From Swiss-Prot:
ATP binds at residues 26-34, 49. Residues 20-310 form the Protein kinase domain. Was identified as a drug target for the treatment of African sleeping sickness. RNA interference leads to growth arrest and altered parasite morphology, demonstrating requirement for cell survival. One of its GO terms (molecular function) is protein serine/threonine kinase activity. The active site is at 152 (proton acceptor). This is Glycogen synthase kinase 3. The gene is GSK3.
Amino acid sequence: MSLNLTDAADDRSYKEMEKYTVERVAGQGTFGTVQLARDKSTGSLVAIKKVIQDPRFKNRELQIMQHLARLRHPNIVMLKNYFYTVGGEGRRNDVYLNVVMEFVPETLHRTCRNYYRRMTNPPLILVKVFMFQLLRSIACLHIPVINICHRDIKPHNVLVDEQTGELKLCDFGSAKRLAADEPNVAYICSRYYRAPELIFGNQFYTTAVDIWSVGCIFAEMLLGEPIFCGENTSGQLREIVKILGKPTKEELHKLNGSSTEINANAKATPWENVFKQPLPAEVYDLCGKIFKYVPDQRITPLDALCHPFFNELREPTTKLPSGNPLPAHLYQFTPDEVEAMTEAQREYLLKK
């Protein structure tokens, strides 16, 4: 749908823009810039993502964020406001969309990197707290009536506060509501976090690509480096095969893939041998349930929330490494989440 964006950058937008004082640039990339700003009326910090807007289309990211904002999910970054601006950075006639979001101090990428630099990994309790909330975020996105696939889950797109243990999924620039009979672009998602069906170019994928990406983050937090670290697309597939073994003919058929670039003798590596140090058996079990070649064989986000790996989060004495209590909202599910649960999931997750 066409949109007259020059008109959109009108008086209302200028009034909205005046509500914030930009303090510094917090991030920059091919998508645009993220600015740290302060709301003049409340004094609270916000993040403003500024992206150039194609005048031919409405911004899908904004539409998705507006929809998600109505759900008020604690693990999805909240859209606070938006406005358009014209010009800037030597491009006088370009129109920019400015998306105002709640501020969260760090990305999971930077938080984990601070541990890796000290030759250690995040404490297991922190992995549990962050993973539980990340799974909740995609469980919400994947509810059938919503059916949004994020398509670019990686540590850079996960916001965290290590002191409070809170986590919020962000950056919905690649997100899309999937329809079963509609093809989608397969060259999506950052390579290290890309599911096998995407590597094979399958255009009729499902939201199960997100659970694969979440699994990659899970393993990375425990390994100190990406679990599948290919230099290119074919190299990425080889790294997956090294750990999962060669897919069967049936699995390849379901992936719409071929075996031409796969080592015919590759056998699965036991999860105990994948990680550098001994870990609880529940870690290996959860990895085995996430990392399946066939998308509909992967554990669902709601089932993953019921996995024994997270049992420690249910204990009232459990605390964060900071000494603070666990986030209060961990088991406070929204009506939409409860509606999407099976009876067994409700029985387990709501009885805490």
